[in-house]
């Protein structure tokens, strides 16, 4: 055993020397004492459960390298502080066990793994501490007991640990392991947008979250914003005055839908193209901020009028992060104008914390898959439309209020490696079309049929009611990856695209039944955070101060939000939202 497991200046007793050959004073290699062997053995034994956990639960090779490098670097810092291997092992393994358990418990309660920002958010005020105490008292007591047990174990280990590590050796280990962790972080690439929700990579997710937490602390708030901004504070009107009863609004979140006409080489039935055309006879391009999945990223911007890109590394779970921190949202604006808001959601309401987010932005009534008695979580669009039509009928029998109905579809969701509803005879792709794309086109044809039927039923069942219908594609289907130049072997999370890529361009359409919407903005592409102001204008509803500023920015930035030139205009807008209390940015 080498010099790093003993005091650097510890003398060598004569009984340890078995040779008559003189040993230089700086070369002091010898077998460690029994106490040191026991201390090292105990340290390794404590690390065995952690090693097994990492092997089975922390992902692929590059992720393993990352989590091991960070863990060992943390241990090296503790060795630098205490000079004792067993103490470092006790603290590292105990704290990892606590973090993994806390992350699991949080995921059970909120459908999201532990993030470094949680430590700052929940411990920053007595109000959040009281929330935890009232709602999760048993968990808090268990955490306190675990921390106390860890402290006692560390004190005992410090008392009996016979190892002594040279601090220069510990510092060298820190440098090497930090370098290894940096390389591993690059190798494992960008974090997948589903990682915090259901990948169960509790430790590596927690480690990764520190970088964006430090970024947020450096920035001073969760969202990018100017240090100061001219202009008055945004006020929220207490009422909404309209000269006539506004139209009912149906907003359809079209899952994984993009116009196939964006790809000139694609052969398909061009009768589908009419699906994407608005009342003005034009197709309008929508720029979203996610590819192939993570619908909640698009939905966040549609409901709040803010870009997820402005949250930096926090963007992938911004729904959970910002629940209760945003005001004057699209649903709240509609509520002020007398609307009743309802949602038809195809999954369970607590999926990726949707229920908390919906409630926080003003969507109080949610019909999830259980409420709708859905046989599966990817029913044909006509199933959700039928439920919505029935609810509209019930509402009109009881109330004269306008109704905002938000419908999320699922039939066009991946995977596309099986034939969805094979009994339905609709065209797919032409000869030579990739099989996944051909299946996607079949489902798109069904989506158009179901949408046309929805319009027909609205006109037939409610001939005296006016309806504004807005539908939009939330992101590309993974089936477009080959058309964008990527391999069929790549999953959605592995497709890396620049912000101006066609892979982020979908569509939005504005339509009406017994109602003619006003003209749409004359711009080439609309960024998704501007869609809520387009909806309010299409319904001819008065705008609050913040939405009037969005309308001005839409024109000034030519429909671009995060990439607006000048960028300072958006950052100043964010500062005014913060100063006005419409965004809690901490």
Which ranges hold each PLM region?
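Transmembrane and membrane-interface helices of multi-pass
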Residues: 2-201
């Amino acid at each position: 055993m080498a010099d790093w497991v003993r005091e650097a200046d510890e003398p060598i007793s004569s009984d340890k020397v078995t040779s008559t050959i003189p040993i230089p004073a700086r070369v002091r290699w010898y077998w460690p004492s029994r106490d040191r062997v026991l201390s090292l053995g105990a340290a390794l034994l404590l690390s065995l459960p952690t090693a097994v956990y990492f092997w089975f639960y922390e992902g692929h090779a590059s992720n393993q390298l990352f989590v091991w490098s960070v863990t060992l670097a943390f241990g090296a810092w503790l060795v630098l502080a205490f000079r004792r291997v067993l103490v470092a092992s006790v603290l590292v393994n105990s704290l990892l066990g606590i973090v993994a358990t806390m992350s699991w418990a949080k995921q059970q309660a909120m459908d999201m793994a532990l993030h470094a920002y949680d430590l700052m958010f929940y411990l920053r005020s007595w109000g959040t501490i009281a929330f935890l105490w009232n709602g999760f008292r048993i968990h808090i007591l268990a955490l306190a007991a675990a921390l106390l047990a860890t402290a006692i174990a560390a004190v005992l280990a410090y008392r009996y640990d016979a190892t002594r590590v040279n601090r220069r050796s510990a510092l060298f280990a820190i440098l090497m392991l930090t370098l290894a962790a940096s390389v591993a972080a690059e190798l494992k690439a960008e974090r997948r947008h589903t990682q915090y929700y259901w990948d169960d990579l509790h430790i590596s997710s927690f480690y990764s979250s520190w970088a964006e937490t430090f970024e947020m602390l450096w920035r001073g708030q969760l969202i990018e914003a100017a240090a100061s901004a001219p202009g008055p504070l945004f006020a929220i009107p207490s009422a909404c005055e309209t000269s006539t009863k506004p139209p009912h609004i149906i907003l359809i979140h079209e899952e994984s839908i993009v116009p196939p006409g964006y790809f000139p080489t694609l052969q398909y039935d061009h009768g589908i193209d009419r699906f994407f055309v608005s009342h003005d006879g034009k197709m309008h391009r929508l720029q979203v901020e996610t590819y192939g999945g993570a619908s909640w990223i698009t939905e966040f911007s549609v409901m709040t009028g803010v870009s997820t890109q402005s949250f930096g590394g926090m963007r992938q779970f911004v729904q959970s992060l910002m629940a209760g921190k945003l005001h004057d949202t699209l649903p709240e604006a509609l509520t002020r104008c007398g609307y009743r808001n309802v949602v038809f959601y195809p999954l369970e309401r607590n999926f990726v914390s949707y229920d908390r987010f919906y409630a926080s932005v003003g969507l109080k009534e949610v019909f999830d898959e259980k409420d709708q008695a859905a046989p599966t979580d990817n029913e044909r669009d006509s199933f959700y439309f039928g439920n919505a039509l029935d609810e509209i009928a019930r509402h009109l029998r009881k109330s004269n209020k306008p109704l905002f109905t938000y419908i999320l579809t699922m039939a066009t969701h991946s995977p596309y490696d099986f034939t969805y509803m094979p009994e339905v005879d609709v065209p797919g792709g032409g000869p030579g079309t990739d099989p996944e794309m051909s299946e996607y086109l079949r489902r798109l044809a069904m989506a158009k049929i179901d949408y046309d039927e929805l319009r027909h039923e609205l006109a037939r069942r409610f001939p005296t009611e006016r309806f504004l219908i807005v539908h939009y594609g939330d992101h590309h289907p993974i089936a477009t990856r080959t058309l964008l130049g990527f391999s069929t072997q790549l999953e959605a999370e592995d497709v890396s695209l620049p912000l101006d890529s066609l892979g982020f361009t979908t569509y939005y359409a504005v339509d009406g039944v017994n109602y003619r919407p006003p003209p749409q903005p004359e711009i080439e592409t609309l960024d998704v955070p501007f869609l809520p102001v387009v909806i309010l204008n299409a319904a001819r509803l008065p705008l609050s101060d913040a939405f009037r500023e969005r309308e001005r920015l839409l024109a000034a930035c030519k429909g671009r939000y995060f990439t607006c030139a000048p960028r300072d205009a958006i950052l100043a807008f964010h500062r005014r939202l913060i100063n006005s209390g419409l965004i809690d940015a901490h």
